[in-house]
Regions:
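Catalytic domains of riboflavin
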Residues: 1-204
Length: 204
C-alpha cells in the first residue's frame, strides 16, 4: 500500500536501530523512540563490529555426504558465536590444494530449492552447479558449493513472501524491497570469503 517517508533529525540513532533490527530479523516493522523508555540496554559501536567480525566463523563439523550428483561429497558446517545461522559447504570430489575449485555461492531459497517455485530459478541453478562440480570431480578436480543461510538475498523468508505479494501487484524485486523498507541487497558475502578461507581455498 501507500507509504510516506519522513526525514529524521536523529539519523545516526535510526541507522543503528535499523542495523540492530536487521540482525534480530524483525524488519520491516519496528519503532524507534529517542526518549527513554524503561531501563536502557547500552549498545556500543564495537558490539556491532564484533558481531560483523567474520573471524568468529569456524568449522563446527564435517561428514561424508553422498548426493545424487556425486557419491564423493562431504558436507562442512560452519558456526559463529554471535550468529545462530549455520552455513554449510558441500565439497564435491577430492579437495586438493594444488587445484583451483569450481565454486558457487548459493543463498538459501526454501521456495525455489525445495518447493520448486516458478518465481525464481534458484532450484535449477543449484542443480546445474552440482552437476558442473560433479563433472569437474570426474576430471580430477573438485568443487565447493557454499550454501549461505541468507534467505531472500538476506531479507528472510517472511519478508521475501511479502515482496512476492507486491510483485504480484506489478512491482519489481527492488521496488518491492524498497516499499517494505528493506535494502536492495542484504547478503553478507564476507561470510562466503571466510568459509573459503577455512576450507583452504586460496583461489577460485
Amino acid at each position: 500500500g501507500p507509504y510516506r517517508a519522513e526525514p529524521l533529525e536523529w539519523r545516526e540513532i535510526a541507522t543503528t536501530a535499523l542495523e540492530l533490527a536487521r540482525i534480530a530479523g524483525i524488519l520491516p516493522a519496528f519503532l524507534v523512540d529517542p526518549a527513554a523508555a524503561g531501563e536502557a540496554v547500552p549498545v556500543e559501536a564495537g558490539d556491532l563490529a564484533h558481531w560483523a567480525d567474520r573471524a568468529q566463523l569456524t568449522i563446527a563439523t564435517r561428514a561424508r555426504l553422498p548426493i545424487t550428483a556425486c557419491d564423493s561429497a562431504e558436507i562442512v558446517a560452519f558456526r559463529s558465536v554471535d550468529d545462530t545461522r549455520e552455513h554449510v559447504a558441500l565439497i564435491i570430489g577430492t579437495q586438493r590444494g594444488d587445484a583451483v575449485p569450481l565454486v558457487r555461492l548459493h543463498s538459501e531459497c526454501l521456495t525455489g530449492d525445495i518447493l520448486g517455485s516458478l518465481k525464481c530459478d534458484c532450484g535449477p541453478q543449484l542443480d546445474a552447479a552440482l552437476a558442473a562440480m560433479a563433472d569437474e570431480a570426474a576430471r580430477g578436480g573438485w568443487g565447493a558449493l557454499l550454501y549461505l543461510r541468507q534467505e531472500g538475498r538476506g531479507i528472510g523468508l517472511v519478508n521475501k513472501l511479502r515482496a512476492y505479494r507486491l510483485q504480484d501487484q506489478g512491482f519489481d524485486t527492488v521496488e518491492a524491497n524498497q516499499r517494505l523498507g528493506l535494502p536492495d541487497e542484504a547478503r553478507d558475502l564476507a561470510t562466503a570469503a571466510r568459509m573459503l578461507e577455512l576450507l583452504g581455498a586460496g583461489q577460485v
